[in-house]
C-alpha cells in the first residue's frame, strides 16, 4: 500500500489556503514562521499539466477530457505515486473536488490516500466570498452553491491540452460536498475543521491539528510549542494579507485572494431572499455543524 497523498479538501473559499499555510509552517519550517512561498510544499491535484499522461495512454480520451465521463476514468491513475512526484512518505495535496463516484469511478481511494483534513465554512459566508473570487453576482454565487451539478475548471497550468478543452472538477452543492467528505467509507485518518474555528479559536484548533498528526499518523515535531506560537502569529489573516499586498499571490485569479476572512459577512451583504435560499436548502447541515 502506497498511501502517499494527504488531502487538504474543502468547498471553494472555505479556508483551504489557511490550513495549507498552517501545515506548511508546521512541516516545512524549523521555527513555524509562515511565508506565502511555502505554499509550494503543497500541490493542487486539479492542474492541467497532470493530464499530459492521458495523451500517452489514450489520445482519443485526451481530447475528450472536458467530459467528466472520460476524465473520471483517470482520477485514481493520475494520483498514483509515480505521477504525483511524491518521493517518500506522503505529500499534501489540495482539492475542491467532491469525494464521489462518477460513472463508477471514485475520486480517490484508500490506496492512494494517507488521510485528509476537510474544512467547512458557513455557506452564507461562502456565497459572499465565492461571488468576489469568481466575479459573480450574489444570486449567481448562491445558484452555484445550491446546484448539484456545479463544477469548476482545473487550474490553468501549462500543458499539451488544447486551450479550448477545459477539464472540470465536480464540486456539487455545498451540502453534497460536505456530506461526501464527512460521511464516507474512505477508511483513513480524517480531521474535520470549521473555518470559523481556524480564525476565531486558532490556538486550540492548531493544537488539534498537531495532536491529529501525532496520534493518527505518528509524527513527532521538534520545538513544538515554539512552532505553534509562531504559526499562530504568522498565519494571522492580516499578516498573510499584508504578504499578498507586498509580494502578490499566484492563486489570486480575480483581484486579491485574501479579502476579509471574517465570519457573518452575509448579514451585511445578502438580502432576506438570498439568505432564505441558502438556509432553506442547507438547514439540516447548517444545524448539524452549528451554523444557526
Across the structure, where does each feature detected by a protein language model lie?
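PAPS-dependent sulfotransferase catalytic domain
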Residues: 1-193, 259-264, 268-292
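PAPS/PAP-binding and catalytic site of the sulfotransferase fold
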Residues: 15-29, 192-219, 231, 239
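Charged, solvent-exposed alpha-helical segments that act as regulatory interaction surfaces
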Residues: 32-33, 218-222, 237-241, 291
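Short, glycine/acidic-rich hinge or "gate" loops at secondary-structure transitions
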Residues: 36-39, 220-230
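A short, structural micro-pattern
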Residues: 86, 110, 225, 250-251
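Short, solvent-exposed coil/turn elements at secondary-structure transition points
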Residues: 98, 122, 196-198, 234-237
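Hydrophobic alpha-helical segments
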Residues: 216, 234, 284-288
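PAPS-dependent sulfotransferase catalytic core
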Residues: 226-280
Amino acid at each position: 500500500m502506497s498511501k502517499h497523498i494527504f488531502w487538504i479538501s474543502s468547498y471553494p473559499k472555505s479556508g483551504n489556503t489557511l490550513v495549507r499555510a498552517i501545515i506548511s509552517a508546521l512541516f516545512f519550517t524549523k521555527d513555524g514562521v509562515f511565508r506565502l512561498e511555502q505554499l509550494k510544499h503543497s500541490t493542487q491535484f486539479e492542474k492541467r499539466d497532470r493530464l499530459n499522461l492521458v495523451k500517452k495512454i489514450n489520445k482519443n480520451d485526451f481530447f475528450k477530457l472536458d467530459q467528466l465521463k472520460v476524465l473520471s476514468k483517470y482520477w485514481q491513475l493520475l494520483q498514483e505515486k509515480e505521477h504525483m512526484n511524491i518521493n517518500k512518505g506522503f505529500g499534501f495535496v489540495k482539492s475542491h473536488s467532491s469525494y464521489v463516484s462518477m460513472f463508477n469511478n471514485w475520486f480517490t481511494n484508500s490506496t492512494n490516500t494517507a488521510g485528509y483534513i476537510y474544512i467547512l465554512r458557513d455557506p452564507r459566508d461562502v456565497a459572499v466570498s465565492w461571488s468576489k473570487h469568481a466575479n459573480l453576482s450574489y444570486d449567481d454565487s448562491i445558484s452555484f452553491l445550491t446546484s448539484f451539478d456545479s463544477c469548476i475548471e482545473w487550474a490553468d497550468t501549462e500543458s499539451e491540452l488544447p486551450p479550448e478543452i477545459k477539464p472540470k472538477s465536480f464540486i456539487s452543492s455545498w451540502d453534497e460536498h460536505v456530506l461526501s467528505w464527512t460521511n464516507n467509507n474512505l477508511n483513513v485518518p480524517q480531521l474535520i475543521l470549521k473555518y470559523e474555528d481556524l480564525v476565531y479559536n486558532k490556538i486550540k484548533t492548531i493544537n488539534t491539528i498537531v495532536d491529529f498528526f501525532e496520534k493518527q499518523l505518528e509524527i513527532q515535531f521538534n520545538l513544538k510549542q515554539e512552532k505553534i506560537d509562531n504559526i499562530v502569529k504568522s498565519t494571522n489573516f492580516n499578516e498573510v494579507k499584508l504578504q499578498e499586498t507586498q509580494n502578490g499571490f499566484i492563486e489570486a485569479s480575480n483581484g486579491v485572494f485574501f479579502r476579509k476572512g471574517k465570519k457573518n459577512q452575509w448579514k451585511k451583504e445578502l438580502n432576506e431572499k438570498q439568505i432564505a435560499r441558502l438556509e432553506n436548502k442547507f438547514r439540516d447541515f447548517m444545524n448539524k455543524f452549528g451554523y444557526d
